[in-house]
């Protein structure tokens, strides 16, 4: 009975590892496909809009308020 329970636990752990690694690897593969795809390289330019290098006076005032 102990052996069967141990085999069941080992099988469950291995199944969980397999299912999680499958999801992880498919996410990596989809990321690679989107980067190397025909439109993937053109859409990387949209990431530049996420960063605004200018800090306004309101931002500085807010940071000072947070620090005090």
Curated annotation (Swiss-Prot):
GO terms for cellular component: extracellular region; membrane; other organism cell membrane. Belongs to the non-disulfide-bridged peptide (NDBP) superfamily. Short antimicrobial peptide (group 4) family. The lineage of its organism: Eukaryota, Metazoa, Ecdysozoa, Arthropoda, Chelicerata. Residues 40-68 form a propeptide. One of its GO terms (biological process) is defense response to bacterium. Residues 1-23 form the signal peptide. Transmembrane segments: none annotated. This is Pantinin-3. The keyword Signal applies. It is found in: Secreted; Target cell membrane. The modification Leucine amide is found at residue 36.
């Amino acid at each position: 009975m102990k052996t069967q329970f141990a085999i069941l636990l080992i099988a469950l752990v291995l199944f969980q590892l397999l299912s999680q690694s499958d999801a992880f690897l498919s996410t990596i593969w989809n990321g690679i496909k989107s980067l190397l795809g025909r439109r993937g390289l053109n859409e990387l330019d949209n990431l530049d809009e996420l960063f605004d290098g200018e800090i306004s006076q309101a931002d500085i005032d807010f940071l000072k308020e947070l620090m005090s």
